[in-house]
Amino acid sequence: MGNRQIGFQTMSDVACRPPWWRRSLLPFLSGVLSVILLLVIAYFGVRKFGTGGRLPERQPKTEAELAAGFSAGAQDEAAANRADIAWQVETLYARQQLDPNATLDFLLLSGGGDHAAFGAGFLSGWASVEGKNAMPKFDGVSGVSAGALIAPFAFLGTPEALEAINRLVRDPKPDWVVPRGLFFFLPENASFADVPGLMRDLCAEVDLNFAERIVRASTGGKRVLLIQATDADLGTGRTFDAVAAARQAVATGDPDILRNILLASAAVPGAFPPREIEGRLYMDGSITSNFYYGDPTDEGQSFGAVWRREHPDAPIPKTRYWLVINEYIRPAPVTLQPKWLAIVERSIYMSVRSSEMIALRHLYAIAEATKLRGGGEVEVRWVAVPQTWKTTKVGYFDKEKMRELSDEGRRLGADPQAWMTKAP
């Protein structure tokens, strides 16, 4: 009878054909391999030709060269510290002749990422206070990480300058932080994101005129503006003299000298590109300390000791530290899910908050020890984002969140009772 036909196929043809899944497997695997091949080609193509996210290759230094650099840096910092204390003593002694209640005042601005909007708002609110609780003219201002971006404006201290930085943080742009694209994860990249918008807006504010104002506000070097960044090569913090940088910017006509210091201090590792300054690679200052309150000093070189030697008959004036913490002082409680990324993020956040609290307690211990040694009275006052403050906004540099933080900061800044006076 012959084979029975189905269409144009015989029963034997159908019996000999492989199953449908086998027929589909080869095209599927071919497609997958093609995609992988294209990705590999793109990967190596980007590595070879796409250099936009990379810094130039750096010439390695020997251990001896790095050790010498570390030693020289430590000596320079110690010399600068002694010079600062010397002018503090003489400046305050002259001021004391006119005002027996004269004080030495330092403003410390911590890191905190986009939460720095709190600090900017706080200073703007504090500027509105009059009378005995009014903002003093600070003898020194220090800034770390996001606090470094606020510090120059706080150093100027005028209502216009304080409102300028508050206005800036209240209006973050979508391009302040942008990913580097599909291959953001390439290990050759300096970071997985870039900050073109933040650089643009910061450069618009920190120009040559701004640098000139910083130099004038230093009153001939009698006031200091210190920015801390982390020296990734030497594994230590470095404190930049931003007044000296501003002076150099004016002399050369290049404000990038000052801008790079500010951006180096705020360069979040991996996220934002580091900065190379004077042959060293710098990144976020909060890696070494989230706020800067001075370097270790031998007892014989302390402010109180120098004062007693130079002016033994004059009472040692009071030193006051005003610390603005651009974050919660303690991690906000959460129910953490047991997922590795959430665990890593929470761990890093907790470690920064813990080290910040330890540093604040250390500052209180220094204040107490200074008083016990007869080095004068030291007051420490601090403020942080209230633990009760909450937001539903998520994302980095979210405009609504930053405006809420600025508003909360302004409210507290206008309230003299907002300052904490005891260690956490």
What are these regions (language model features)?
Residues 144-145:
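Catalytic nucleophile serine of serine hydrolases
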